[in-house]
Amino acid sequence: MKLKILMDNHTEIDVYYLGEPAVSYWIETEEKAFLFDAGYSDAFLKNAEGMGIDVTQAEAVLLSHSHNDHTGGLKPLLALDFLKKPQFIAHPDALLPHDWNGMEIGSPVSKEELSEKFDLHLTKEPVWLTEKLVWLGEIPHTLDFEPAYAIGTVEKDGEKREDYISDDTALAYVGEKGLSIITGCSHAGICNIIAYAKKLTGVEKIQSVLGGFHLFHVDERAKATISFLKEENIPELYPCHCTSFAVRAALHGECPVKEVAVGTELEWK
């Protein structure tokens, strides 16, 4: 499986793509191609064009969660002409209104708009995209140091309630050397995600983890996360997006952290 980073907070020197505080990945397997998250704007589409990637070839568009740094680019994506009607796979809560301090932070496009271009598959359950690649669905909180926490509110069944971001999910690829896990923001907790991916696939060895860890301070939660990741003995860690420099530096003191940016290509067999 090959993965190309279409959007991240960071760009590389002498590699002239656009960056923004957002995430988008292009994934190719032997059988199919997938778009995982759509950044904050149309910048991921401009980067894809510069990389020679035609996103209209996607078998499915996958969402990690609702927040607009992952869904903001859906509006320009809808303006494209797809050769066939791709699937759109997301948690049912991902397309609900999400608010933070009076500001809408959810998807800028509705379920009805998306259904015009995509075959919507809204589910809490895991979806096997290929024999080796799975969209994990709703992540259970099983680790005491990674409890659910609220960010703003979500409007559901006609009422606003605290948003515990239950729509947050990730991908797992079953490779020859173990699992490779790809996250958006890891609001569910990167360690909860790893634990669930292992349980779901039956694979104990983690080969790599890529994505946002949603850790900004080297606090008790971050320290417990670092201890967990060290215990897992993961050869390749690619924390990016919503992982601060301080946390990445602390993690690098204990684990093999590798740098990624817009345009980085990774491959797992």
Which residues does each predicted region cover?
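Active-site-proximal loop/helix segment associated with metal-binding centers of metalloenzymes
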Residues: 102-104, 125-176
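Active-site metal-binding motif and surrounding structural segment of the metallo-beta-lactamase
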Residues: 43-91, 201-208
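Conserved beta-strand hairpin/beta-sheet module of binuclear metal-dependent hydrolase folds
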Residues: 2-51, 164-183
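Active-site metal-binding loops of divalent metal-dependent hydrolases
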Residues: 8-10, 38-41, 66, 92-94, ...
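Pre-active-site segment of Zn-dependent metallo-hydrolases
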Residues: 17, 32-60, 75-76, 147, ...
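Cap/insert and terminal regions of metallo-dependent hydrolase folds
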Residues: 67-71, 76, 164-170, 174-261
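Active-site neighborhood of divalent metal-dependent phosphoester bond hydrolases
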Residues: 93-116
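General small-molecule cofactor/ligand-binding pocket signal
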Residues: 4, 89, 119-124, 134-136, ...
